[in-house]
Amino acid sequence: EIPLRLVGSEMCIRDRIATRTSLIIDFGGGLKQEDDLEIAFESGAQMVTGGSIAVKNPEMFTSWISKFGSEKIILGADAKEKKIAISGWEETTSQELIPFIKGYYDKGITKVICTDIARDGMLQGPAIDLYKEIRDEIPFLYIIASGGVSSIEDIEKLSEAGIPAVIFGKAIYEGKIQLKDLLRFT
């Protein structure tokens, strides 16, 4: 493992994106200590997402919520069959998805990126029922759905289900969603 503070090329790229665009940057992956967050924020990230760290070191992750504020810390909740997966999806834990998210909501988290691993990159449609279940259980949580989006209709269905944000990639790369089609959601 390479500590985040030694990964100069990623910091340089993030810095260039931050200074040359008006994009809001969320940095995730490899956050293991407070210094990593400081560097991410100094390099232009407005938010950071912690997933594995929230499982492996909940005290540290909770301290980040207190120190940096819930508007800057996003919980990453990657799930396989409603169990939390960590370490780049290499390990599935015994922690149930919704109680895991609820526990951090009770500690101040206001945003979660929830990825249904089985659907990610598969273009089979998002896990709308799963996101509705989370929304029903934790109504004031800002849910960012991830995984499975294959069309603009999928995004519409998420919006209709009360899911305010979505992450997708493959549908853009494969031309199934055009950027111009997204303008109606702004």
Please report, for each region that a protein language model flagged, where it lies by residue:
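Short loop-to-alpha-helix "cap/lid" segments that border enzyme active sites
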Residues: 14, 90-114, 125-140, 144, ...
